[in-house]
């Protein structure tokens, strides 16, 4: 099974599909943050849930890093073009400004921004799972202390 990182690295047109996939997975994962039902079962399921969702976050991080690398490469090619082909001498600062305005660079940075937002949503999910683990631990401690009626 090839992951989304490989798909995106092979074909940048797969980015919308990757975003849709991870948004859909995020919606499913949000249900896993809720603590309800049997505490023992919830505790037993937590390691697998955390491993799966953390691995997905790592794939998003890898795609984001790949996009940043490609954007730097694109910026570099425009930078070189301006330095070599412009009639008058330009300062590096001038060239930076021109490169910042290139449509391809702007489009890339928008995609990077969208992926960064997706990554941040997943970081929020992982924080929620951390809180769930903490709550499970507290409920178990209450039960050990004799407060059997701790309900969720």
PLM segments and residue spans:
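Terminal, low-complexity, charged helical segments
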Residues: 1, 31, 38, 150-151
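Extended, charged low-complexity scaffolding/tethering segments
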Residues: 1-30
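Short, charge-rich amphipathic alpha-helices with coiled-coil/heptad character
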Residues: 24-55
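Catalytic phosphate/metal-binding cores of nucleic-acid and nucleotide-processing enzymes, i.e., regions
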Residues: 61, 81, 123
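Extended, amphipathic alpha-helical coiled-coil scaffold segments used for oligomerization/tethering
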Residues: 67-110
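Long amphipathic alpha-helical coiled-coil segments
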Residues: 68-76, 107-142
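Acidic, low-complexity, intrinsically disordered peripheral segments
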Residues: 143-152
């Amino acid at each position: 099974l090839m992951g989304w990182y490989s798909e995106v690295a092979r074909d940048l047109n797969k980015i919308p599909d990757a975003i849709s996939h991870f948004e859909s997975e995020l919606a499913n994962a949000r249900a896993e943050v809720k603590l309800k039902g049997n505490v023992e079962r919830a505790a037993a399921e937590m390691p697998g849930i955390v491993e799966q969702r953390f691995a997905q976050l790592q794939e998003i991080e890898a795609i984001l890093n790949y996009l940043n690398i490609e954007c730097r490469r694109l910026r570099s090619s425009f930078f070189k073009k301006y330095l070599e082909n412009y009639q008058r001498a330009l300062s590096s600062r001038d060239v930076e400004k021109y490169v910042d305005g290139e449509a391809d660079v702007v489009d890339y940075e928008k995609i990077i921004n969208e992926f960064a937002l997706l990554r941040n949503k997943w970081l929020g999910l992982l924080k929620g799972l951390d809180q769930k683990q903490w709550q499970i631990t507290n409920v178990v401690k209450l039960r050990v202390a004799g407060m059997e009626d701790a309900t969720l």
